[in-house]
């Protein structure tokens, strides 16, 4: 959600901070700010509501100098978007940036007011600045002071503290919100996402839960939650430096839709061989664990939840393993009964989704057979804290509305279904069929993308619409859910998805000539049932858009537009039918004039509850 960048260097670092914030814009924010200290201890703070370019313009006018600084993009949780609420927050010579939520900020605020502190914002972050300042009066180094402040805070946070009287160091602490150290030569950096620092380094140290770190130009000192000095591994980043460039595309989302064939190829690379699925990357003991699995519990949020819902059909119908899927924010706050030999699978593009991480940590106390993360970010908290991990290889995804991360999650899940099915004694043809279908998938999606202009023309029919229904059956029902999510995220059209068989249980009351109804209709065993549901909509004057297999026997008629799609193997149809819904949502958003890549009120990575 929010973004943090910090630097300790000999050179001027204002432009490094601003470029880092630019590269974090995809995470979602409403204001931005920075604070820079020069060698004489002079602090300059700039804050602006709106986009990073407004902050950049202000910085150019200031001609900022200084080798130590912190910067932040804010996504409002406490207090409206305003310059007063933007970070960094200061208390005399102390400056602080912070991601997360301090749950006990109200009693801390009252305590600090009683000590004579005056607050200039509505934020929870300002209490950190005043607490550090208060503790500094009691004595000790900045590192010692921050260590004393941390136990007073309840909630999730990643925070960086700077003292303008000593610009040689920054202190950072991580509890529930990610932070990464960028390792330079004679300079070091801090950020909430490695992407922010790729212009200046490719060497990173990912902080663990509870870590506190002191960063100077020449040293990085890390302390664990017990206060012990500890070494964390340094990792060479494999993220592409140009991942943040749109290239020839108008929006990141459009670029990422078109990158899906290559993203799927990359995800399959090295995992399909001689007609078999090779997941040896899981390690030598993984097969023994997977063979014991009698139940699968999937935990996810948002788009990842929809991919989990698709895989439930696959795990049960193809591998014969019972599977449940639950929203992470619900799972973590209820008492659950864990089935014998149950494998917990977590899904997250970023690997830092707060509720999913909390659910994983909770699961360790509940007796699961093991945990397996499916994630797009190597080195993320979810990957590090799980027993097993399978990486999607989608590359950096910038657009808030997930596209290639979703289809590569499904690709990995289908391979996992094939592997578990084989270990559980499924018919030998299952693995062959999955391999054959997945090998053909990138080319199938290329075919689909050639229909972009056709789908763009359809989008015109949504220009004056405020509501939409999506319908699907079987494993296409979660695809309808994903289509509805995409449309509401980026076009702000209220959209809902229903299993088509549920029409008579309520949704039919909404059908009229102003209600677009989008249907996904592959040529499978449920097609005739689906056709009956379509006729129910037609009989009530609904406006139908049917994405149908070319062999399904549909033709255009009054009130019903048919988009004929190439035939694909049933096993990969959910992945294939996702793409036209992504394109439809994208083009509708263009017509509506919304911010496609950074839709209002949303963030790419939800790192707070």
UniProtKB/Swiss-Prot annotation:
Signal peptide: none annotated. It comes from the Bacteria. It is an enzyme of class 2 (transferase). InterPro entries: GATase_2_dom, GFAT, GFAT_N, GlmS/AgaS_SIS, GlmS/FrlB_SIS, Ntn_hydrolases_N, SIS_dom, SIS_dom_sf. One of its GO terms (molecular function) is glutamine-fructose-6-phosphate transaminase (isomerizing) activity. It catalyses: D-fructose 6-phosphate + L-glutamine = D-glucosamine 6-phosphate + L-glutamate. The active site is at 2 (nucleophile), 604 (for fru-6p isomerization activity). GO terms for biological process: carbohydrate metabolic process; fructose 6-phosphate metabolic process; protein N-linked glycosylation; UDP-N-acetylglucosamine metabolic process. Coiled coil: none annotated. Residues 286-426, 458-599 form the SIS domain. One of its GO terms (cellular component) is cytosol. Keywords: Aminotransferase, Cytoplasm, Glutamine amidotransferase, Repeat, Transferase. Residues 2-218 form the Glutamine amidotransferase type-2 domain. It is found in: Cytoplasm. Pfam families: GATase_6 (PF13522), SIS (PF01380). Homodimer. This is Glutamine--fructose-6-phosphate aminotransferase [isomerizing]. It comes from Yersinia pestis. The lineage of its organism: Bacteria, Pseudomonadati, Pseudomonadota, Gammaproteobacteria, Enterobacterales.
């Amino acid at each position: 959600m929010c973004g943090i960048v910090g630097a300790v260097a000999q050179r001027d670092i204002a432009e490094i901070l601003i470029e880092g914030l630019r590269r974090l814009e995809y995470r979602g924010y409403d204001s931005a700010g920075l604070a820079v200290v020069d060698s004489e201890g002079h602090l300059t703070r700039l804050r602006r509501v709106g986009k990073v370019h407004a902050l950049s313009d202000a910085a150019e006018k200031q001609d900022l100098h200084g080798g130590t600084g912190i910067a932040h993009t804010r996504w409002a949780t406490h207090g409206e978007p305003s310059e007063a609420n933007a970070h960094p927050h200061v208390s005399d010579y102390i400056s602080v940036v912070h991601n997360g939520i301090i749950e006990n900020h109200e009693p801390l605020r009252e305590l600090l007011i009683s000590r004579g502190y005056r607050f200039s914002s509505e934020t929870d972050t300002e209490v950190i600045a005043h607490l550090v300042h208060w503790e500094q009066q009691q004595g000790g180094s900045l590192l010692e002071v921050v260590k004393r402040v941390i136990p007073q805070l309840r909630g999730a946070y990643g925070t960086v503290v700077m003292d303008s009287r000593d610009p040689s160091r920054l202190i950072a602490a991580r509890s529930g919100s990610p932070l990464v150290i960028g390792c330079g030569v004679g300079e070091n950096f801090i950020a909430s996402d490695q992407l922010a620092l790729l212009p200046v380094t490719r060497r990173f140290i990912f902080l663990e839960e509870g870590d506190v770190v002191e960063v100077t130009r020449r040293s990085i000192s890390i302390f664990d939650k017990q206060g012990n000095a500890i070494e964390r591994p340094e990792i060479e980043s494999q993220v592409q430096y140009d991942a943040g460039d749109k290239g020839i595309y108008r929006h990141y989302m459009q670029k990422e839709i078109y990158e899906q064939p290559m993203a799927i190829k990359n995800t399959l690379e090295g995992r399909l061989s001689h007609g078999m699925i090779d997941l040896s990357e899981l390690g030598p003991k993984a097969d023994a664990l997977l063979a014991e699995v009698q139940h699968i519990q999937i935990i996810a949020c948002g788009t990842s939840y929809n991919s989990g819902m698709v895989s439930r059909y696959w795990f049960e119908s193809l591998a014969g393993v019972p599977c449940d899927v639950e929203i992470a924010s619900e799972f973590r706050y209820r008492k659950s009964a864990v089935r014998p030999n149950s494998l917990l699978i977590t899904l997250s593009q970023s690997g830092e989704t707060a509720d999913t991480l909390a659910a994983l940590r909770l699961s360790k106390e509940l007796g699961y057979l093991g945990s397996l993360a499916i994630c797009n970010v190597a080195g993320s908290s979810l990957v590090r804290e799980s027993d097993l991990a399978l990486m999607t290889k989608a590359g950096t995804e910038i657009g808030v509305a997930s596209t290639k991360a979703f289809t590569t999650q499904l690709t990995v899940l289908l391979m996992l279904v094939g592997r578990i099915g084989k270990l559980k004694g499924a018919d030998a043809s299952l693995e062959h069929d999955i391999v054959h279908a997945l090998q053909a998938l990138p080319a199938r999606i290329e075919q689909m993308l050639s229909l972009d202009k056709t789908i763009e023309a359809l989008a015109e029919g949504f220009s004056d619409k405020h509501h939409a229904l999506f319908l699907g059956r079987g494993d296409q029902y979660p695809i309808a859910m994903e289509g509805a999510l995409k449309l509401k995220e980026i076009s702000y059209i209220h959209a809902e998805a229903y299993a088509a068989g549920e029409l008579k249980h309520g949704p039919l009351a909404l059908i009229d000539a102003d209600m677009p109804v989008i249907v996904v209709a592959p040529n499978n065993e449920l097609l005739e049932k689906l056709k009956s549901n379509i006729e129910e909509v037609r009989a009530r004057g609904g406006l139908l858009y049917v994405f149908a297999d070319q062999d399904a026997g549909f033709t255009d008629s009054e009130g019903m537009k048919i988009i004929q799609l190439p035939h694909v193997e049933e096993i990969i149809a959910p992945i294939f039918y996702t793409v036209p819904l992504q394109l439809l949502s994208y083009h509708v958003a263009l017509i509506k004039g919304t911010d496609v890549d950074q839709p209002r009120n949303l963030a790419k990575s939800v790192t707070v509850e």
